[in-house]
UniProtKB/Swiss-Prot annotation:
SUPFAM superfamilies: Class I glutamine amidotransferase-like. The keyword Hydrolase applies. Its EC number is 4.3.2.10, 3.5.1.2. The gene is hisH. Residues 1-207 form the Glutamine amidotransferase type-1 domain. It comes from Shouchella clausii (strain KSM-K16) (Alkalihalobacillus clausii). This is Imidazole glycerol phosphate synthase subunit HisH. Keywords: Amino-acid biosynthesis, Cytoplasm, Glutamine amidotransferase, Histidine biosynthesis, Hydrolase, Lyase.
Length: 207
């Protein structure tokens, strides 16, 4: 059973509907005692990094997640949820993140090295480039996934499982131990996204 964390800033409907289509058991909760019954957690996220961290702190979700990760239980962050897994962000103001993964979150510059402007936010379909085999990506086909974001993670390459290109290399899937992140929206990413969610569900069940 997967617990989807409801902290007021996640696209709960689309994530839950994707799990339903895959016949993956799930529940949605903001309560730590309930979430503790899950085998794995999904941290979705839409909005601003400082607002999300403020809510996670005020609602005591952060200390709950700290214990969850310390116990090496699976946690998947999606979009903003992935960014929150890192050490810090400069969105609006310098803000500390959950710190489960090394790195920081910065805004796309909007300008190439040659001085050409490009559109921010990054919105649309981009091809995934897999860098190394992992259980999460086993059997997942090559293809495109759907991004909507203005901020991008700067991190160590050894935790980057897959990336995409948007005027720079964009970490798209990251993993360290049982902490996973997807910058794109797998629940909106057709075949590839659904295959990744299915694999996450299989890993949770030990398959």
């Amino acid at each position: 059973m997967i617990g989807i964390i409801d902290y007021g800033m996640g696209n709960l409907h689309s994530v839950s509907k994707a799990l339903e289509r895959l016949a993956i058991p799930y529940f949605i909760s903001s309560d730590g005692e309930e979430l503790a019954k899950a085998k794995a957690l999904i941290l979705p996220g839409v909005g601003a990094f400082p607002d999300a961290m403020n809510i996670l702190t005020q609602t005591n979700v952060q200390p709950f997640l700290d214990n969850w990760v310390a116990e090496n239980k699976p946690l998947l962050g999606i979009c903003l949820g992935m960014q929150l897994l890192f050490e810090s962000s400069n969105e609006h103001q310098p803000t500390a993140g959950l710190g489960y993964l090394p790195g920081r979150v910065e805004r796309f510059s909007g300008t190439t090295a040659e001085g050409h402007a490009y559109k921010v936010p990054h919105m649309g379909w981009n091809k995934l480039e897999f860098h190394r085999p992992t259980p999460l990506t086993e059997g997942v086909p090559d293809g495109y996934v759907y991004f909507v974001h203005s901020y991008v993670v700067r991190t160590e390459t050894d935790i980057v499982v897959a990336s995409s290109d948007y005027y720079q290399s964009v970490p798209a899937i990251v993993q360290k131990g049982q902490v996973y992140g997807m910058q794109f929206h797998p629940e909106k990413s057709s075949t590839v996204g659904m295959a990744l969610l299915k694999r996450f569900g299989q890993l949770v069940e030990g398959n």
